[in-house]
Each structure stands twice: as structure tokens, then as C-alpha cells.
Amino acid sequence: MKSMNIAASSELVSRLSSHRRVVALGDTDFTDVAAVVITAADSRSGILALLKRTGFHLPVFLYSEHAVELPAGVTAVINGNEQQWLELESAACQYEENLLPPFYDTLTQYVEMANSTFACPGHQHGAFFKKHPAGRHFYDFFGENVFRADMCNADVKLGDLLIHEGSAKDAQKFAAKVFHADKTYFVLNGTSAANKVVTNALLTRGDLVLFDRNNHKSNHHGALIQAGATPVYLEASRNPFGFIGGIDAHCFNEEYLRQQIRDVAPEKAELPRSFRLAIIQLGTYDGTVYNARQVIDTVGHLCDYILFDSAWVGYEQFIPMMADSSPLLLELNENDPGIFVTQSVHKQQAGFSQTSQIHKKDNHIRGQARFCPHKRLNNAFMLHASTSPFYPLFAALDVNAKIHEGESGRRLWAECVELGIESRKAILARCKLFRPFIPPVVDGKLWQDYPTSVLASDRRFFSFEPGAKWHGFEGYAADQYFVDPCKLLLTTPGINAETGEYSDFGVPATILAHYLRENGIVPEKCDLNSILFLLTPAESHEKLAQLVEMLAQFEQHIEDDSPLAEVLPSVYNKYPVRYRDYTLRQLCQEMHDLYVSFDVKDLQKAMFRQQSFPSVVMNPQDAHSAYIRGEVELVRIRDAEGRIAAEGALPYPPGVLCVVPGEVWGGAVQRYFLALEEGVNLLPGFSPELQGVYSETDADGMKRLYGYVLK
């Protein structure tokens, strides 16, 4: 590894004797230094507090030619003699040796060995790629180290990622300590796989699973299709803007749940623990965060285990006002359920795409019949893991844990929360049409008038007060949910927040999203009159200021009714005949009117309400088996009413199934997809990604949606 720098007071830079590069204190963020040298004056200027706040635990030396008392936070006093330079170098070396987490440290050392290999992968450290011009370009683009770190598990020096030995095991133990789990498993093919690992380890045919209707499709795949478990669905909320909300409070009532069990498995209705597993979204895609303590206290005694799908959170325990939502920080006893938490590290933590982790917290039920031992979980783990893992992915998970260790993780997320608050304030100051999704008034005072430090430390500034008009969610209890401060959620015109009804004019969020992408800004997702931007410690003031500026510019285009060719040139140039002479407001009005004509906001809401759920006539596993056997036919969604779905269907994002295999097409779900079909034809260039239904062009040139149903 390249030697790290030493940071020093500017007056000391030229006086330090070291083979390392010496940089001034003002020229570093301290991520590239292994030791710090300050003067007595520096020690009184606040630098020691700054260094402590980083959480990096850097060795700090005070340079003084006179005897001085050793300040707190200083390793030693030096005056420049040769022995003391050696002490400085020794401290820097020790810092470097302890800096890297277990697996990544071993990986870097192994790469430096430059072994000659006759094992997989066949590109042999990139040499194969370099034998062709395209391969050479590929190699140069990614850089040497990624190819050298892509190696075979034939050499045991790096440990085993499947049976968890060596430095791989050490890395996962380290992550478990950082995240307060009993065990942690690194997953290299996303939380879609992580959820399947957990559900395949716990569920079998005939088991009952308490199932959040908001769950990501991977939970349907693992629990219902692969394991064949029987779901008891929990209805969830959608608001008029299109945001995904939480489960209704009444769904956590024991008698209500036992009645639901009587409808699907009466023989299990009176069992002490009727559910083998409950699967709950700890945080929804749109930033509704649950109180984990409430969930466990209300339904935990009915469940052997609870899986908190935390794909869209995972950082909550590092943010004090979110800590109550973390299942991993809870004190649990032998009467509580076992806990699994799956996290998409790549979403808002520091990980390559596809990096995920499973946290297991169940030592409190060890020895009970319901306990899931490591060997059983690992059996499911190996069902879904590749025997040819990409080591840089595993290393990224290891480094992510190191980044979050101790004060470092808390500081990084505190800065993220504060930056998000400042950005919301800037939007409120600059924009008239786009509004941050937060309570407009708290205790009679405008949200933005509170100091940022106050907003960042008190959850009530992000809480969903039951019945409050601003959020439009129904069925919530007090202190049940709050807005994730690290999800910048905006609403667009089109909904009267006081009534929840459509206004005369609207700006569908997909049009704003297209404009932002045209101008180099990529939002996470949008739906109806809502748009989402993910915030992480990677953000900067400059980056978010650019976003605010683009929002203000788009508002000006709305006010000026600018030509569409000027605002969305890519869409206009692709469909010049359809959008000839269109203005921006004209496009907004047509799309808004389409939403109104189908009442899309209410269709979307109804799909996740129990009274509108599609009828269940088959176990999802049986319906899927019929699909695999070819006992299906492809029909137009328009003609699918009353037919049994062979595939789950959904728009992506968010990846939440609207109809599940074995359910009957009809009602709100069918009308919702017909509304999407109408939009595909009426407004080309704004088609959503649909899965489980298929767009085909008919003889009349119109696109029609089809789906597989059982014969």
C-alpha cells in the first residue's frame, strides 16, 4: 500500500523529517494521513476537537521546543530529535497497519504478492483482455487493481466465502459487531438474494407468513413461490401524491390477525405463535420508517421470527433520532421473536452495486425449537451464492463496516442529515411548485424557521401525525411512522393537499424527472406527483445546490410555458410528430388529465387496501408451477378479468407486486394497468418499466398489455 501522508501545521511542514509526504492541516480532510503534528497554538484552536470528531483515531503529536503539558487527545510531545521522528514514523506505521478491515487487508496483501496463476478467472489478472484492442480499452478503463483482485477461490489465503472461514469470516464478524448483530452474512447478488436466503431458511409449504403487502417482489419469490408458504397480507397505505406508506395500525391488533388466520388456515388460528415468519419493510422506498420496537411489542409474540427488509435503510442506528427504528439495537428476551435484517448496502451505504448483508439477531432464543441455526441458514445461503464470487464486492462490504465503525459512522450520517435539512430549506426558499415532504408547521412555527441542529435531533419534525393533511396517509397511529431524513422527497403540483383531490392543473413528476436527466441530474424514482432523491454521506453542498437550481429553472419553464423542444429535447426529437408545437404546460396538462380520467391515485391506493386485494384462489407456488409447465395462455389485460394470474405483475420501480401468482385479475389492479396502457399510447417517451405484463404492438399500431393467465 502506498504510504499515507503526515499532516502538520503549515509552519512545520518544511521542518518535519520523514520519507512521507507532509501536507498542511488545511490541505487535507484527514482521510489520506497516518499522523498529525500540531503546535501548541493549534491545540488551542479547536483542531483536537475536529480530529476527534472525524472518528479516525489518528495519532497526534504536539511539536514544541519547550516542555509543555500533554493535552488530552495528543499522543506525545516531540521537539525534533531523531528518536522522536522514529516515534512519529512508528505511530504512522501502526495506524496504517490497523486501518484496513480484515478481508480487504488480506486482499490487498495478496494482490501485492503477484502470484502466477493457472486457475480461474481466465483473464489472468487482465492479461487476456490486453491481447485485443477492445480488451485493452476495457482494461485501461477500469484499471489494473480490479483485474488483479478478481481471483479464484482455489487459493485458500483469502478464506472461504461460502463456508465462512479465514479473513472472510473475520470480516463478517467485524460487520456484526459494528451493526450490533449476532451474526452477519455478506451477500453478493443483492438484497433480492438476501431475502430469499432468509425466507428459504425459515419457511416451508404450509407455514404461515405475515406479509407486508408493500414487500419487494424478492420476498414473494422467496417466501411464496420458492418456499410455498401461505401469506396473511397486511394492508398498507398510499397517499394521493403516489408515495408508498406503511401498514395500517389496526393490522397489528392480535384479534384482527387471528381472524385473518381463520380465513386462510383455521387450524393455526389459536396457536401461541401462528406465524413462522413476519416480513416487514423497515423503511419503504419512499421513506416511511417503522418503529421496530412497536412492531415487536404488538406482533412479535405471534411470530417465530421477523424479517425486517431494510433494503432502503440500514443506516438508522447511526442517526440518534432514528435509533428507535433499528431492530438491531433492541434489547430482546426469550419471549421475543428472532430477528433478521437484510440491508442493501449499495443503496445508501458504501458498497458496489449488488452488495447486501444479512444480520441475524436471535441468540436470545437459542435452544428453542424455533431457533434457526447457522448451518441451516448457510444451507440456504449456498443455494443462492455463486461459487465464483467477485472479491471486490466482498471487500466493499468489509470496508463499509469499517467506515461505519464508531464515531466515524455517526459523524458521516449526522452531516448527511444536516445537509438534507439545509437543502429542504433552500427548496422552500427558492421554489413555489415543488415542496419538500415534511410537516409544514410544527408547534405553530414553520418547519424551516427552526435551527438545523434542532431539526436534525428531534424526530417530531419528521413524524407523521395521524390525520394531518400534509401527508395524506390514512390509518396511522401516533409515533408509528416518520419520514426518513435521508430521503429527499418532493411533491409536484396536481394534488390539493387539504382535500386529497386533483387540482385543475398538475405537473406529473415523470416530466420533472425527464428534465433533470436532460440536465445531468438523476433522481432515484418518481411516481404520479412525487419524486425521490437519495441522500448519503457522499453528497456535497455544491451538488445539492445544483439540484435546487435545476428545480427553480424548471419552475421558470412552467411559468413561461416554454416550448417542449427546448425543455425536453430528447423526447421531442424522438417523437417530433406527436409533440410538434407542444409547450411544457400542454404536456403537463395532458398527462395530468390522463391521471384524472382514470383516477390513478385512487387506483394505486386501492390495490394495497384489503377490501380491494385481488381474490386468492391458488397458492402462489402452485400457480407458478402451472406457468413453468406451460399450462397458461397470454391474454390482453383488458380481457383478463376473472382469470388467474400466472405471473406477478408490477411497475418498476418500486418493484412491489400489484397482483401475485394465484390471484385473480380484475378490479383496481386491472384498471391500473389499463391506465398505464393508455399512457403508453397517448404519451410516448414516458412509458414505465413493467414486469410480469408484456407490451406488444397490435396490427393497428397500438401498444397493448398482455399477461399470462392459467388455462
Region spans (language model):
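A short linear hydrophobic-aromatic micro-motif
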Residues: 184-185, 342, 520-524
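Conserved acidic residues
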Residues: 31-36, 73-82, 182, 207, ...
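Conserved N-terminal alpha-helix of the aminotransferase class I/II PLP-enzyme fold
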Residues: 144-193
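Short amphipathic alpha-helical segments embedded in low-complexity Lys/Glu-rich regions
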Residues: 190-193, 238-241, 530-532, 567-568
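Short strand->helix junction
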Residues: 23, 192, 285-286, 540
